[in-house]
Amino acid sequence: MMPLSRSRLEFIATILQNVLNLGLLTLGLILIVFLGKETVHLADALFVPEQASKYELVEGLVIYFLYFEFIALIVKYFKSGLHFPLRYFVYIGITAIVRLIIVDHKTPMDVLLYSAAILLLVITLWLCNSNRLRRE
């Protein structure tokens, strides 16, 4: 089998990068639609006087921030020269675990394990932002 030339490999990489960019752009637009739907849902939950709606409101707020963080991640990808910064994934992970604690807090051991996971992610975030792991 004949190896591909450098120009062909670059052409393939360019095609795949464009497909990735188009997919992320589509995902961003879908997330904006979901963000709008979540805004309407939050407005509905805000004006319902029942106690159960307060939990729904808090859960909706955290979901809202997850959508917002994913959209911010996609924006950052395009602004930073087609690169995903690691710390944005860590922020999303922390927010997702906080949502899980709010929604599913059945046993104290689960909450403790989720809290330990958040602590691990915060330590990861600290290491990523420290000078030890900074890129040149």
Curated annotation (Swiss-Prot):
Keywords assigned: Cell inner membrane, Cell membrane, Membrane, Transmembrane, Transmembrane helix
Q: Which domain of life is it from?
A: Bacteria
Can you supply a Gene Ontology BP term from the record?
cellular response to phosphate starvation
Q: Where in the cell is it found?
A: Cell inner membrane
Membrane topology according to the record: Multi-pass membrane protein
> For this UniProt entry, what's an example GO CC term?
plasma membrane
The record places the following residue ranges in the Cytoplasmic compartment, namely: 1-14, 76-82, 129-136
Q: Which residues cross the membrane?
A: 15-35, 55-75, 83-103, 108-128
Q: Which residues lie on this side of the membrane: Periplasmic?
A: 36-54, 104-107
InterPro entries annotated for this entry? P_starv_induced_PsiE (IPR009315), P_starv_induced_PsiE-like (IPR020948)
Parts forming coiled coils: none
Q: Which family does it belong to?
A: Belongs to the PsiE family.
Q: What's the name of the protein?
A: Protein PsiE
Gene name on record? psiE
